[in-house]
Amino acid sequence: DAQINEAVINVLKNKGLSRAMVVTSNDGIDELSITSKAAVHELRHNEITSYEINPEDYNLSKCSISDIQVETLEEAYLYGIEILNGKRGPGFDMVALNAGAALYVSNQVESLAEGIEKAKRELHSGRPLLLLNKYAKFTHQI
């Protein structure tokens, strides 16, 4: 809901955050989605702007929610491993979109488009899966 998102972004501003995004996809998902456009409230340089993100504007294929849903924990795990290993598809695009937004909002890149492209390159490289495996190995040692 736009009113809730506006209230949340104002709370973040009042708490002193310098950069933030609050998003709701038109399909009701509380993150950026490739299934629909998303309403965004962005805090940057102490200014709040509101706009819409269309995944198709970033060369991401639009799909239905059923294309990215999983039924079991095992399916979710396997789907996640495929994405982290660079397998293209709706899940890959969904992760690239949200990782790109994270890179953008954390000032790692200048634009959402640049963030998405950087996220795609990283996913294709296989490094995210290597990091996950290192993390898993480390947590089993402690």
Where are these regions (language model features)?
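Glycine-rich anion-binding loops and their surrounding alpha/beta cores
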Residues: 1-142
